[in-house]
Regions:
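A short, surface-exposed alpha-helical micro-motif characterized by mixed small hydrophobic
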Residues: 100-102
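Conserved ABC ATPase "signature" region
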Residues: 8-28, 137-138
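Helical segment within the ABC ATPase nucleotide-binding domain
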Residues: 73-86, 98
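ABC ATPase "signature
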Residues: 118-119, 127
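A short, proline-enriched helix->beta-strand linker immediately N-terminal to the Walker B motif
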Residues: 52-56
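Conserved ABC ATPase signature
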Residues: 32-37, 41
Length: 151
């Protein structure tokens, strides 16, 4: 931590951040090794570590990968809360377009390391211009409504 805090003050601040990311028993989590934590807990610890210096930008690279849907939802809610309360910009990197649609105001679509399309999320999702973007969006699983299935 790049501050003038004492060792005890740094520990106290770290435990406060673990509490802010909604980890139960933050004092215990502070003492644990990563292999002793679940995937969701490890993700929260990483978010707490990233937020401890009050950054203006948080880079969230695949923050929900390998997490079950319930924990994904909690991590997404946490990121939204951080964005809203701390006014921290979040660069959300993901292959999960349903999460991108839910979280992002602007979207960059990349292929082979190059940006192929960018713009406001609504524009990208509802009026994609590039064929690659259209194919990605077409691959998003859709819930089949009963009325559609019956007709």
């Amino acid at each position: 931590l790049h501050t003038e805090l004492s060792k005890e003050e740094r520990k106290k601040r770290a435990i406060e951040m673990l509490e802010k990311v909604e980890l139960h028993n933050p004092e215990q989590v502070y003492e644990q090794y990563p292999h002793e934590l679940s995937g969701g807990m490890r993700q929260r610890v990483m978010i707490a570590a990233a937020m401890i210096c009050d950054p203006k930008l948080l880079i969230a690279d695949e923050p929900t990968t390998a997490l079950d849907v319930t924990i994904q939802e909690q991590i997404v809610a946490l990121l939204k809360r951080i964005n809203r309360e701390k006014k921290t910009a979040i660069l959300f990197i993901s292959h999960d377009l349903s999460l991108v649609r839910q979280l992002c105001e602007r979207v960059l679509v990349m292929r082979g390391g190059y940006v192929v399309e960018s713009g406001p999320a609504d524009e990208i999702f509802y009026h994609p211009k590039e064929e690659y973007t259209k194919k990605l969006i077409a691959a998003i699983p859709r819930v089949i409504r009963k009325t559609e299935k019956d007709s």
